[in-house]
Amino acid sequence: MSVAAVFRGLRPSPELLLLGLLFLPAVVAVTSAGPEESDGDLSCVCVKTISSGIHLKHITSLEVIKAGRHCAVPQLIATLKNGRKICLDRQAPLYKKVIKKILES
């Protein structure tokens, strides 16, 4: 018996093929669904924070990452004029100054 003859005997029924086609969109939807965050990492970005030593005039931009499944606390990341990114400590006066400036503008 040839290999082709064996495979001819294993053809699925039309009902089975139709069932497979019906489940295909569900399988694709489940496998393409990712975590909420686009970076794919479900952990806090700010492992270490800075509480002092940075003046507001050295900050060029801010990024706020709200609390969620990835991290229990909101994170505030400041980009400095030299390109360095730092995480600000939520309990520090600097954090409160930055938030106040954001709310005033």
Swiss-Prot record:
Intrachain disulfide bonds: 44-71, 46-87
Glycosylated residues in this chain: 31
Signal peptide: 1-29
Gene Ontology BP, a term: response to aldosterone
Natural source organism: Mus musculus (Mouse)
Record: residues binding heparin: 96-102
Summary of the function given for this chain in its UniProt record: Chemokine released during platelet aggregation that plays a role in different biological processes including hematopoiesis, cell proliferation, differentiation, and activation. Acts via different functional receptors including CCR1, CXCR3A or CXCR3B. Upon interaction with CXCR3A receptor, induces activated T-lymphocytes migration mediated via downstream Ras/extracellular signal-regulated kinase (ERK) signaling. Neutralizes the anticoagulant effect of heparin by binding more strongly to heparin than to the chondroitin-4-sulfate chains of the carrier molecule.
Gene3D superfamilies, per database record: 2.40.50.40
Pfam (any one): IL8
InterPro entries: Chemokine_b/g/d, Chemokine_CXC, Chemokine_CXC_CS, Chemokine_IL8-like_dom, CXC_Chemokine_domain, Interleukin_8-like_sf
Localization of this protein: Secreted
PANTHER family reported in the protein's UniProt record: PLATELET FACTOR 4, SMALL INDUCIBLE CYTOKINE A
Cellular component terms (Gene Ontology): collagen-containing extracellular matrix; extracellular space; platelet alpha granule; protein-containing complex
Subunit details: Homotetramer. Interacts with TNFAIP6 (via Link domain). Interacts with CCR1. Interacts with CXCR3. Interacts with THBD; this interaction enhances generation of activated protein C.
Sorted UniProt keywords: Chemotaxis, Cytokine, Disulfide bond, Glycoprotein, Heparin-binding, Phosphoprotein, Secreted, Signal
Family to which the UniProt record says this protein belongs: Belongs to the intercrine alpha (chemokine CxC) family.
Name of the featured protein: Platelet factor 4
Positions of modified residues (Phosphoserine): 61
GO molecular function: chemokine activity; CXCR3 chemokine receptor binding; heparin binding
